[in-house]
């Protein structure tokens, strides 16, 4: 393998701010004083958006009489959309509709700096924040005057999340210990725990002499047993329901065979282990493979070679095994690897910042960073060639697949804990061709019109025109506390008898993409006991008596109309059965009462329209800032728990902190949106700094979440970070070695439908950030690695 240097930019991985900064263009301009502070937000997470709105409302309530109020300017398209919007306004010198603040990544400071539009927070007290999380300001290109230009108000890092049951199957099968279906049944009946080698001649060895490896293997076994319990329980319930005689039989009470049951379930999708050269044949497994990139990629490559369902599948469908290792952020993983290979020293990285300018001579002259990239790429290429690497394709996050046992482990943001695991009833929507999306939160089923009962007319009016124009209906529940259609009320996600609230919020599987970065877990909309409202979907026109945006939506997309009408006309398999297919292991008896026919779904969850199955439609007034979509041509599928990953079956480790085990320094990425100031005019600049100082330093009273929750007293910055599963890098947090920060480790049970869970990702993030704050770990920030012209690998 060799490198060929060329003028190819890592499109999508790196920006152009540093290159533009090198041109030295200046063009500072003032904006019109409009008497208010505008905060630009492109947050896609409901929890973060809701928290930010509450912060704005709080400030406007407690601010001084003469202080400028603050309002949110919503920008579509996630952080990339926010970046594009800011660059456009800078380029056209927008003096009337620009904003004062933006929540985004600090590379935007370079964009502002090249035209002198950056705003230093020299009137804001930042002494409560740990210094190590502010020093990236010294490495921002296009900024010559030292100062604080970006304040990290919502930090996250990355973790390695291991699917315990899947990894157990991989290691156990490579040891020759995975029993066949018949032998598993026989050992269960006899009480024997014996296994066979299944033709494995040189089995994998687990280095149990190493204490860390021994401990990890025991943990992996326990996770497999947890998964096996679900399988055993499901089978016993099925047997009991199908035969009264079975109810009197003695069932096994120990869990000695649960791990085998788990392996058997995983084998159905992963296939059988193949003993091949360069695979896991005669391989010695150690816990240290997860501590450095070189060994992790090598081990992953060996696993991929050992399973034909991975290495021979060149046309993966959404329901297939996607690989061994999943990576949500390609630039994060690639550049962190290279940074670690350079000893965690920016002098050995792609660029150096001197006097506000980025110097890329180290890379251009084929120096240390070039050589390190060459080594790192070689490791990645091996895994790519064996088809074992899954990368996020515009929103198809690893957790979408890992929670369905389609990956062995993945590297993802700590802000995504409540996205990463399946609920009690794990549902997804399948499309033709094997593609799917996880069942989004904030979703309602659309029902076909019932003849002679749902015309949409006023007071029972059932005119022919109204009946012909009615496509379907769905129901929403408004909170009892709702004061008006535009108030803080929200809708309860529901489809038939099941709720989408316990599912994660709309992350797209293979085929259609999700918007924005991966963010925080979904929150359940609405409350029990709310007022139920029927919403009518019409084509052509909305009849009198119905109000657009209140209880009616007009569908003018012909494809949607045709799909809804086609679904409504389809013959049911049985009279009274929904066309939705429920693939449930624990089946329920079919009700004799006629059920309404489901012909589609509508959601305000964060799913991306593909204009094939998912389309944008008009939203309701109660949807507030969240866009509504319609989903057609989907089949709902409910999976057995043994086919899904629960949080208690995962092993959460730090993402690899070294390139090779012999490296001296550990490296951890720090990421997350900063609050960034923009020059407007003298008066508004002062008002902007006043708000930011209040945001960071003024404790306020906040209502607790859920029944019985007490009010809390904290700053707006703390409230925002904790509400969104982020971490505010306060010195006091890192000094509390084993204490849990209120709100950051627990999530209200309504936000995920699975009761209270310890946020394993946040706990790991706090551990890593403490290491950074005490200089035990080197922090890497990708947000200022911009405009690098790099080579093509060949």
From Swiss-Prot:
It holds the Pfam family Lipoprotein_10. Residues 1-22 form the signal peptide. One of its GO terms (cellular component) is plasma membrane. A lipid is attached at residue 23 (S-diacylglycerol cysteine). Keywords: Cell membrane, Lipoprotein, Membrane, Palmitate, Signal. InterPro entries: Lipoprotein_10_C, Mycoplasma_lipoprotein_cen_dom. The keyword Signal applies. It is found in: Cell membrane. Residues 182-200, 245-261, 511-526, 577-593 have a biased composition (Polar residues). Residues 182-208, 222-261, 474-529, 566-594, 737-757 are annotated as: Disordered. Residues 567-576, 737-751 have a biased composition (Basic and acidic residues). It is a lipid-anchor. A lipid is attached at residue 23 (N-palmitoyl cysteine). It comes from the Bacteria. Residues 475-501 have a biased composition (Low complexity). Belongs to the MG185/MG260 family. This is Uncharacterized lipoprotein MPN_152. It comes from Mycoplasma pneumoniae (strain ATCC 29342 / M129 / Subtype 1) (Mycoplasmoides pneumoniae). The lineage of its organism: Bacteria, Bacillati, Mycoplasmatota, Mycoplasmoidales, Mycoplasmoidaceae.
């Amino acid at each position: 393998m060799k490198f060929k240097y060329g003028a190819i930019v890592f499109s999508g991985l790196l920006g152009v701010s540093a290159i533009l900064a090198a041109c030295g263009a200046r063009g500072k301009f003032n904006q019109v004083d409009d008497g208010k502070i505008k905060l630009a937000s492109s947050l896609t997470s409901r929890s973060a958006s809701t928290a930010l709105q509450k912060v704005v409302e709080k400030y406007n309530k407690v601010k001084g009489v003469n202080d400028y109020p603050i309002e949110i300017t919503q920008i579509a398209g996630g952080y990339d959309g926010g970046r594009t919007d800011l660059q456009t306004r800078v380029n056209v010198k927008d003096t009337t509709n620009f904003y004062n603040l933006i929540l985004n990544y600090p590379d935007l400071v370079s964009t502002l700096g090249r035209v002198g539009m950056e705003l230093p927070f020299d009137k804001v007290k930042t002494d409560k924040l740990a210094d190590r999380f502010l020093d990236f300001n010294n490495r921002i290109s296009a900024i010559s005057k030292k100062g604080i230009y970006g304040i990290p108000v919502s930090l996250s890092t990355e973790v390695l999340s291991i699917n315990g049951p899947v990894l157990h199957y991989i290691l156990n099968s490579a040891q020759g210990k995975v029993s066949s279906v018949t032998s598993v049944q026989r050992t269960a009946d006899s009480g024997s725990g014996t296994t066979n080698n299944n033709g494995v001649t040189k089995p994998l060895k687990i280095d149990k002499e190493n204490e860390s490896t021994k401990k990890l293997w025991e943990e992996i076994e326990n996770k497999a047993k947890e998964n096996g319990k679900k399988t055993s329980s499901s089978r016993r319930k099925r047997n009991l329901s199908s035969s009264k005689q079975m109810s009197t039989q003695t069932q096994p009470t120990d869990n000695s065979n649960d791990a085998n049951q788990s392996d058997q379930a995983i084998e159905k999708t992963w296939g059988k282990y193949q003993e091949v050269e360069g695979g896991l044949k005669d391989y010695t497994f150690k816990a240290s493979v997860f501590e450095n990139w070189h060994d992790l990629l090598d081990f992953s490559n060996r696993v991929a070679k050992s399973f034909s369902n991975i290495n021979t599948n060149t046309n993966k469908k959404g329901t297939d095994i996607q690989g061994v290792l999943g990576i949500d952020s390609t630039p994060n993983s690639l550049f962190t690897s290279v940074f670690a290979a350079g000893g965690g020293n920016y002098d050995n990285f792609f660029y150096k910042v001197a006097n506000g300018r980025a110097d890329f001579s180290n890379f251009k002259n084929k120096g240390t960073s070039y050589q390190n990239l060459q080594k790192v790429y070689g490791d990645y290429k091996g895994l790519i060639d064996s088809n074992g690497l899954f990368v996020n394709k515009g929103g198809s996050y690893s957790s979408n697949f890992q929670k369905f046992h389609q990956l062995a482990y993945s590297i993802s943001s700590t802000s995504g804990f409540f996205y990463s695991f399946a609920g009690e009833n794990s549902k997804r929507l399948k499309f033709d061709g094997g593609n799917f999306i996880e069942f989004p939160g904030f979703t309602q089923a659309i029902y076909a019109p019932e003849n002679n009962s749902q015309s949409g007319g006023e007071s029972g009016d059932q005119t022919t025109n109204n009946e012909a124009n009615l496509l379907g209906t769905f129901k929403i529940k408004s909170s009892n506390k709702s004061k008006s259609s535009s108030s803080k009320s929200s809708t309860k996600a529901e489809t038939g008898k099941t709720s989408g609230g316990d599912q994660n919020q709309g992350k797209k599987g293979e085929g259609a993409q999700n918007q924005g970065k991966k963010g925080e877990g979904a929150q359940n909309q609405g409350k029990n006991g709310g007022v139920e409202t029927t919403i009518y979907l019409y084509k052509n026109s909305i009849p009198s008596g119905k109000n657009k945006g209140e209880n009616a939506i007009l569908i003018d997309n012909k494809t949607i109309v045709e799909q809804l009408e086609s679904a409504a006309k389809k013959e049911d398999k049985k009279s009274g059965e929904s066309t939705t297919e429920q693939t449930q292991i624990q089946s329920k008896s079919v009700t004799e009462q006629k059920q309404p026919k489901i012909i589609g779904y509508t959601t305000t969850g964060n799913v991306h329209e593909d204009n094939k199955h998912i389309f944008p439609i008009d939203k309701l007034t109660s949807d507030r800032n969240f866009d509504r979509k319609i989903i057609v041509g989907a089949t709902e599928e409910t999976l057995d728990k043994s086919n899904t990953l629960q949080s208690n079956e995962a092993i959460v480790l730090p993402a690899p902190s070294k390139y090779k085990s012999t490296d001296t320094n550990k490296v951890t990425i720090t990421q997350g949106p900063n609050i960034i100031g923009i020059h407007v005019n003298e008066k508004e600049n002062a008002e902007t700094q006043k708000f930011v100082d209040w945001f960071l330093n003024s404790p306020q009273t906040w209502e607790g979440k859920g029944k019985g929750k007490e009010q809390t007293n904290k700053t707006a910055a703390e409230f925002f970070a904790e509400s969104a599963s982020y971490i505010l890098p306060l010195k006091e947090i890192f000094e509390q070695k084993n204490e849990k920060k209120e709100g950051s480790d627990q999530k209200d049970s309504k936000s995920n439908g699975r009761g209270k869970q310890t946020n394993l990702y946040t706990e790991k993030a706090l551990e890593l950030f403490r290491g950074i704050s005490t200089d035990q770990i080197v922090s890497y920030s990708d947000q200022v690695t911009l405009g690098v012209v790099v080579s093509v690998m060949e």
